[in-house]
C-alpha cells in the first residue's frame, strides 16, 4: 500500500472522541487528554489518528497530524461502496453494506464521521460487538481498506469484469 500525500488533498477534520484520564498525586489530580480525530477529503480518502497531551487543543493537533499519516484510499461506486464487508478491530466489528442512491448514511456516531469524510453518500452500517469509539473507528477504516472494485478483482483473477459481475 503506497503512502498518500496529505499536503495535496483538501482535508477536513472531525473530532470523534475526547477522553480525560486522571492521575492522582500527592498535590492533587493531574488531567491529561486524548483525542480521536478523523480526517478526509470527502472524495475517497480518509484516515484516523490519536493525539495525547496535557491540553485538549494540543491533543487534537497531534491527532490530526497522526491521522494525516494514516490515510487510505476508499473505492466508491456511484456514491456507495462496491460490496458488503465486515471491518474488525479488537472486539469492535462494523458491518458495512452498500445502499441505493438516496438512502443516505445510516450509521451511528463514530462510524458516521468516518464515512462522511470518506465521501460515501449512501451506505447502511451496523455496529457489532464493542461500542468503544476508538475500536469502531479503526474497525470501519479496516473494513473500508479491504474494499475492492470489480475491476481490481477481475485483474487479480485474470478474468473480465463481466465474468466477475455475472
From Swiss-Prot:
Domain S5 DRBM: 11-74
A Pfam family matched in the record: Ribosomal_S5
GO BP annotation list: translation
GO MF annotation: an example: rRNA binding
UniProt keyword list: Ribonucleoprotein, Ribosomal protein, RNA-binding, rRNA-binding
Any one Gene Ontology cellular component term annotated for this protein: small ribosomal subunit
Superkingdom of source: Bacteria
Annotated family: Belongs to the universal ribosomal protein uS5 family.
NCBIfam families named in the record: rpsE_bact
Subunit relationships: Part of the 30S ribosomal subunit. Contacts proteins S4 and S8.
The record's note on its domains: The N-terminal domain interacts with the head of the 30S subunit; the C-terminal domain interacts with the body and contacts protein S4. The interaction surface between S4 and S5 is involved in control of translational fidelity.
Function recorded in the entry: With S4 and S12 plays an important role in translational accuracy. Located at the back of the 30S subunit body where it stabilizes the conformation of the head with respect to the body.
UniProt protein name: Small ribosomal subunit protein uS5
Amino acid at each position: 500500500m503506497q503512502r498518500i500525500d496529505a499536503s495535496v488533498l483538501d482535508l477536513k477534520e472531525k473530532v470523534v472522541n475526547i477522553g480525560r484520564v486522571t492521575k492522582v498525586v500527592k498535590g492533587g489530580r493531574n488531567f491529561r487528554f486524548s483525542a480521536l480525530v478523523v480526517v478526509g477529503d470527502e472524495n475517497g480518502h480518509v484516515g484516523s489518528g490519536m493525539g495525547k497531551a496535557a491540553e485538549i487543543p494540543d491533543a487534537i493537533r497531534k491527532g490530526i497530524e497522526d491521522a494525516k499519516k494514516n490515510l487510505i484510499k476508499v473505492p466508491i461506486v456511484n456514491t456507495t461502496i462496491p460490496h458488503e464487508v465486515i471491518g474488525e478491530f479488537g472486539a469492535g466489528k462494523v458491518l458495512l453494506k452498500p445502499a441505493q442512491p438516496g438512502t443516505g448514511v445510516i450509521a451511528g456516531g463514530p462510524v458516521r464521521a468516518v464515512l462522511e469524510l470518506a465521501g460515501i453518500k449512501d451506505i447502511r452500517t451496523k455496529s457489532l460487538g464493542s461500542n468503544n469509539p476508538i475500536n469502531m473507528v479503526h474497525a470501519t477504516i479496516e473494513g473500508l481498506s479491504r474494499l475492492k472494485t470489480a475491476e481490481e478483482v477481475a485483474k487479480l483473477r485474470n478474468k473480465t469484469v463481466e465474468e466477475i459481475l455475472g
